[in-house]
Regions:
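Secondary-structure boundary elements
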Residues: 49-182, 457-505, 541
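Short Pro-Gly-centered beta-turn/loop motif in secreted/extracellular proteins
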Residues: 658-679, 765, 890-893
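Disordered, acidic Ser/Thr/Pro-rich linker "stalks" and the adjacent N-terminal cap
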Residues: 180, 191-205, 705-767, 778-843, ...
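Hydrophobic/aromatic-rich core segments of domains that either
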Residues: 43, 140, 163-181, 457, ...
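Extracytoplasmic
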Residues: 181-308
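Short beta-strand-plus-loop segments that form exposed binding edges in beta-rich domains
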Residues: 286-294, 773-779, 900-906
């Protein structure tokens, strides 16, 4: 058992009544620092601060980080990585951290290292923020202590992250509301002196190059009154931390450096907003060359409007009518539109017309959904096709919780409202058409056609909403405007970055993404934390994600790229055996249950989390018999399968020869085990918790034999990933002219790819010298391998031709025989890859494999099939693949199997074999 676990257990044994005194004893030379904190808050007028200090100090013995030169170097490399183009960050980080020697790192327990000044400042900032919130009285103090107050989330090095957020994002505490996007102003439509360049990936196929002194783009922007706007650039640049010079009406405006693209054919949107105040009338905005080459596609002008939430009217409990000041007509939402989307209309008032009776659903900070009154109808008002263009139609569609379906009511002071779309920042306007008005969106000009009256028309008896005005969850919608600045990468990092570095770099893996969101939430006094599954139930690896803690102690996810509480747009097929919730406080129940164990798995070292699986799924309590040889054991562990081993995800207490594992996820195969000498020791047979909660033991049948035909060693998880649709619309062609102007399309791929080889016959008697695959728009022409065959069945060879690919994904990779390498064009559009033959040939067929995980059966690789037998994996047979299908005969039926590739790779997955197919678990 590690020294740290001994420390925790000894501390816990005496912590029941004297936890503060014991923490101070454990502090050693740092005791005086912690006593300064207690003395500082002892007589503070806000008694919450003293209780907060006690809570933190009592729990500091269970929190730690690492210190030393290696840790500082590690953090520095993270920040350097953040300045690299997104596709290159993973490689950059790995290459530079591989050389770091961590032998000098020091284990630093918080109670022995955190100083008084830091802790006092952290407590002041957290408590003062909490006192300013509208929701402080909704929450128990313990929820504040665990999910707002803490100065750290995991074991990251410490920093003053609250101050950093306040300085970087003052908007978050100002009485304003931003639109998610805004009006789009093309560079080529402005006045410019740079070079106009055609490029397929620009929004209109053109960009203006700012690549020499004097090159500039000048926009003229007119507003009816002084107003603030938020500027974003759509641009391309390859220099690290590239700069562009901005002047507004001749006055220089500071801008943040731009992140690099991996080529000048890839476009990015600036991650940091530039806030400007425009004067009444015409304004000139000039973007000029400042030493770095930048291709400017367009300027996006988002709205920033004053909004005072404490003065907002709450319409959520009432049915309402909305009428236009100019025409007096009423917004009308039909129950059965002929087609969707359809244009919304205004009609003259008709007594008793239910289509003019509206339900206003509160969607979070300043935002409302506008729907017909009937609760079983999901038709709502939206900007069609998420348009940000002037005079574009506003219509009806099914509610999808998109920003284009959210509306901001801004009072004008005369009983009317301006109604702004949250996505576009444009305003709802009536457009007369005969006896009705249609609805469009336009910049606000003050016309009566843009002014609206909202009248209450009786109570809404079916009102039910997760959002309430003035709630923590409502406030979190403000963060939705900036969480998109974070860029995910799949890099491997055992230590979380320092919070200040994370908030600056805004990039990382799922853990970092979750931490980033939680820091932002807590800076506003929004209770938030990280939920995690210690290991997926049907694939390798663990996962973590951010959640907002509600006043009842339960939580709702705040997935990156989604509005808070929006789970509809975040789907995958991964199963969670357990979901735990990080907190600052030690889980004393878990520690007591495990206190008699000589050693415990790493997961349960000082467990500062609680089980919340029941908040996510229907679960099952599982009871398993314990072998008599282990009668002296107090706990056992329930495990799921990793690539090679059984991994513990929870424990159960043993009583009367049985162990009970509570609240386990369903549709997952498990194994019960003990933990001895640092190893998992399975007992019994694997078992499946089925979808209905019943438990099925997986028992092999040695007498009943069967034949297995196997295609893969691991399930294809890519079917939910973004790249799986990238070949839809891609064309395979032959031609005799090098520019393919005479191209004949052999085949067009439609739909989603499955990660396996495709073999396509070609019914064409023509002969072609040039052969290619051309990807659809937005796909980067992703394809991993491509083979063409002649009429004699032989694979054709020739000179590799095509467009430019990324350095790590050139066109040559499509013909290198490695299914894990493939082509990726330097920009999303206009790419292709193929062969130039020495002579024209008739094509009989072609084969290709899309982006994939490399887990399909590969010809020439050596495989072994094993099954679970008597507490271990037993070998059944070994084969070298002669095709992309392996056939194993005389196999015991009903078992749990694993197919291993002995030639290469590491991903493997358990499966059963049912009705002639692999069933993955």
């Amino acid at each position: 058992m590690s020294k740290y676990i001994i420390f925790v257990l000894l501390f816990l044994c005496v912590a029941c009544d004297k936890s503060l005194d014991n923490a101070l004893q454990q502090a050693g030379d740092n005791r005086s620092e912690l006593e300064k904190v207690l003395a500082h808050f002892k007589d503070d007028p806000d008694s919450l601060k003293y209780r907060a200090a006690k809570f933190l100090i009592e729990n500091m013995p269970y929190h730690y980080t690492y210190e030393g030169k290696a840790i500082e170097a590690y953090d520095s490399i993270y920040l350097q990585m953040a300045d690299e183009p997104l596709p290159e960050r993973n490689k950059f980080f790995k290459e530079r951290t591989d050389s770091i020697r961590f032998s000098d790192k020091r284990f630093a327990v918080d109670v022995q290292t955190v100083k008084a000044d830091y802790l006092i400042r952290a407590i002041d900032e957290a408590c003062d923020t909490w006192r300013r919130t509208q929701w402080q009285d909704d929450y128990d103090e313990e929820l504040f202590f665990n999910y707002v107050l803490p100065y750290r989330i995991l074991n990251e090095p410490l920093s003053d992250w609250r101050t950093i957020i306040a300085e970087a994002h003052p908007y978050l505490t100002e009485p304003v509301v931003w639109s998610k996007r805004g009006e789009q102003m093309e560079a080529e439509d402005a006045d410019f002196t740079g070079n106009l360049t055609e490029t397929e990936s620009a929004s209109e196929g053109k960009m203006v190059m700012l690549d020499h002194d004097g090159a500039k783009v000048t926009y003229t922007y007119t507003v009816p009154a002084e107003t603030r706007k938020v500027l974003f650039l759509r641009y391309t640049a390859t220099a690290r931390r590239a700069r562009v010079a901005l002047t507004l009406n001749g006055r220089s405006i500071p801008t943040a450096p731009l992140h690099p693209a991996n080529s000048l054919k890839n476009f990015l949107t600036s991650r940091s907003a530039t806030l400007v105040t425009l004067k009444k009338g015409a304004n000139t905005l000039t973007f000029a060359y400042a030493g770095d080459t930048i291709g400017l596609d367009y300027l996006q002008v988002a709205a920033s409007e004053l909004y005072h939430p404490e003065c907002a009217e709450d319409y959520s409990n009432d049915y309402c009518q909305i009428s236009n000041k100019h025409s007096g007509r009423y917004l009308t939402i039909g129950l059965h539109p002929d087609s969707l989307p359809c244009v919304a209309t205004l009609k003259r008032f008709v007594e008793g017309d239910s289509t003019q009776l509206l339900r206003l659903d509160y969607k979070g900070y300043a935002c409302w959904g506008i729907s017909v009154c009937y609760p079983d109808s999901d038709f709502c008002l939206e900007t069609e096709y998420c348009s940000v263009k002037y005079n574009s139609p506003v219509g009806l569609y099914h509610a999808l919780n998109g920003s284009n379906q959210k509306w901001v009511f801004l009072p004008t002071g005369d009983g009317h409202y301006r109604i702004m779309n949250k996505d576009s920042g444009l305003f709802l306007e009536a457009k007369p058409v005969g006896n009705t008005d249609t609805l469009v969106q336009n910049p606000y000009t003050g016309k009566d056609t843009q002014l609206w009256k909202i009248e209450r028309k009786g109570k809404n008896p079916t009102y039910s909403s997760l959002f309430r005005l003035g709630s923590a969850l409502s406030e979190a919608l403000r963060l939705f405007d900036i969480t998109g600045q974070f860029e995910w990468i799949g890099y491997e990092s055992s230590l979380p970055p320092r919070a200040s570095s994370l908030l600056s770099g805004k990039t990382g893996n799922c853990r970092d993404e979750a931490d980033y969101t939680v820091y932002l939430c807590r800076s506003l006094g929004i209770p938030a934390t990280v939920d995690f599954t210690p290991h997926w139930g049907n694939r390798s690896n663990s996962h973590a994600w951010p959640v907002i803690v509600l006043s009842d102690g339960k939580a709702t996810p705040f997935y990156m790229g989604c509005a808070p509480a929006d789970t509809v747009h975040y789907y995958h097929s991964y199963k969670k055996p357990k979901v735990f919730r990080h907190r600052f406080q030690l889980n004393e129940q878990y520690t007591r249950d495990l206190s008699q164990e000589e050693e415990v798995p790493q997961l349960f070292n000082a467990p500062k989390f609680t089980d919340v699986t029941d908040e996510y799924y229907e679960t099952t309590d599982v009871v398993r018999d314990v072998p008599t040889d282990y009668a002296d054991k107090h706990v056992a562990y329930i495990c799921v399968f990793d690539n090679r081993n059984w991994v513990p995800v929870f424990y159960g207490n043993i009583r009367d020869g049985k162990v009970t594992f509570t609240s386990m996820g369903r549709n997952i195969v498990y194994m019960a085990a003990f933990y001895e000498h640092g190893q998992i020791v399975p007992f019994g047979e694997p078992f499946l918790i089925k979808g209905d909660g019943t438990v099925q033991t997986i028992q092999r049948n040695e007498k009943k034999r069967t034949t297995l035909k196997l295609l893969r060693k691991y399930p294809f998880m890519g079917k939910e990933d973004f790249f799986n649709a990238r070949m839809s619309g891609g064309r395979f062609q032959g031609a005799n002219l090098p520019d393919f102007s005479d191209a004949k399309t052999f085949y067009t791929f439609e739909g989603l790819t499955n990660g396996n080889w495709y073999k396509i016959p070609v019914n064409d008697e023509g002969k072609y010298r040039y052969l290619r695959y051309i990807g659809p728009m937005g796909s980067h022409c992703n394809i991993n391998e491509l083979e063409f065959y002649g009429t004699d069945g032989a694979k054709l060879s020739g000179s590799i031709i095509g467009t430019e690919g990324d350095p790590w994904a050139s066109k040559e990779t499509v013909f290198d025989g490695d299914i894990l390498t493939g082509f990726s064009g330097v920009s999303p559009d206009g790419h292709w890859v193929g062969l130039k033959l020495s002579l024209p040939q008739q094509i009989s067929k072609f084969k290709f494999i899309p982006r994939n995980d490399g887990n399909g059966v590969e010809i020439g690789d050596e495989y072994e099939l094993v099954y679970w037998k008597d507490g271990d994996w037993a070998l059944l047979d070994t084969q070298i693949a002669a095709s992309n299908v392996l056939t194993f005969k005389n196999v015991p039926s009903g078992g749990l199997y694993v197919l291993r590739d002995k030639t290469k790779g590491h991903e493997e997955r358990i499966f059963t074999y049912e009705k002639g197919e692999q069933v993955w678990w």
